[in-house]
Amino acid sequence: MHQNPRLILASSSRYRRAMLERLRLPFESISPDVDETPQAGEAPAALALRLSVAKAMAVARLHPGCIVIGSDQVATVDGQPIGKPGDFARAKSQLRQLSGRIVEFHSALAVTDGQRTEQADVITYCEFRPLTDAAIDAYLRAEEPYDTAGSAKAEGLGITLMESMRSDDPTAIIGLPLIALTGMLRRFGLDPLRSPS
């Protein structure tokens, strides 16, 4: 009887866990111990890819024989990274800055079995509509998106702040690009549509 290898999500993010649950594959979530400090001159896409691989490898080293998923997301406007605001004041300032502008989200993904690693970067372009202070305040009070880069949760009320969104994978904006991920998992022998044997 063939058994699928154990699947691990190298993340403590509840958003990524919820996304992976959609694939109906059994998995566990383990928080990786990775320094997320950007390197000098590192481009946002390179940072997201490096961190996704580092997270996957950090967990894979401790769990040989498992398939490990690492991911990271970096948001930028005009090439400058936008972090997680942490509190109301910084979130308000961030949303004022993003009003009427396009934000580029790099959602990087790495899958490894410890021997071989695949990676991808899925880009999402979000155009924010012009935002009034009243709209910003109402949104922040309703959703408190202080742990989200760009201060807007597209999977929730944050979608009301958007004018448009472009991406090859509509799930990428939430931080785990499922279209790219399912292709990678199939190449590692895990297919969500195939019953475990």
UniProtKB/Swiss-Prot annotation:
Its main location: cytoplasm. Its cofactor is a divalent metal cation. GO terms for molecular function: nucleoside triphosphate diphosphatase activity. It catalyses: N(7)-methyl-GTP + H2O = N(7)-methyl-GMP + diphosphate + H(+). Keywords: Cytoplasm, Hydrolase, Nucleotide metabolism. The active site is at D72. One of its GO terms (cellular component) is cytoplasm. It comes from the Bacteria. It holds the Pfam family Maf. InterPro entries: ITPase-like_fam, Maf-like. It is found in: Cytoplasm. It is an enzyme of class 3 (hydrolase). Its EC number is 3.6.1.-. GO terms for biological process: nucleotide metabolic process. The record marks Y15, Q73, E155 as: Important for substrate specificity. Belongs to the Maf family. YceF subfamily. Nucleoside triphosphate pyrophosphatase that hydrolyzes 7-methyl-GTP (m(7)GTP). May have a dual role in cell division arrest and in preventing the incorporation of modified nucleotides into cellular nucleic acids. HAMAP family: Maf (MF_00528). This is 7-methyl-GTP pyrophosphatase. It comes from Bordetella avium (strain 197N).
